[in-house]
Regions:
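Extracellular glycan-modifying ectodomains
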Residues: 1-165
Length: 165
């Protein structure tokens, strides 16, 4: 592999953060994460305006927030300087945070949106997603969801249709 990797021992994940079960703590795992192939930048975005820089890999974190420092909304953009002439949007929950850096070599910009209420509102986004796609010149859209946000959930049945307009 061309990717350099690092590991975090004692990784507990999101489920542990929600219930702090001692049984889960006994099942701690090793998390392997991969560094981007080229230097990358990440920004919190409202509409098309970059509001603040965020880390692509937050190696000071010892949990799932190592990936992009966690979820930020209403939008996030990753730039890797690959000059492909293409942009993409990933509609995702937090699982997209681990996957987005792998898509950077194929796009100028990787945009991300998480429609869960704590991260997204049309007011904070200053408009709808369809307009955002047009303004950012996005050609491809990926949907990356964990099982808990997948088929048959409110994310798919309500949040996505309501916010993609």
């Amino acid at each position: 592999s061309d990717y350099a990797s690092q590991t975090i021992e004692g990784f507990l994940g999101s489920i542990y953060l929600h219930n702090r079960s001692a049984k889960l703590k006994d099942l701690a795992d090793t998390l392997t994460y991969y560094e981007p192939l080229a230097p990358a930048e990440s920004f919190w975005v409202s509409n098309t305006y970059r509001k603040g820089e965020l880390k692509v890999l937050d190696t000071e974190q010892k949990d799932y927030k190592v990936f992009l420092g966690g979820t930020h909304g209403p939008y996030r953009v990753l730039d890797g300087g690959y000059h492909t002439g293409r942009n993409m949007l990933m509609v995702c929950d937090s699982f997209g945070n681990a996957i987005a850096p792998f898509l950077m070599p194929y796009y100028d910009s990787v945009y991300m949106v998480d429609f869960r209420d704590e991260y997204y509102s049309k007011e904070a986004a200053q408009g709808g997603v369809a307009e955002y796609i047009r303004r950012c010149g996005i050609q491809d859209i990926y949907v990356v969801l964990s099982e808990s946000e997948g088929v048959g959930t409110a994310f798919i049945n309500q949040l996505m249709p309501a916010n993609l307009k």
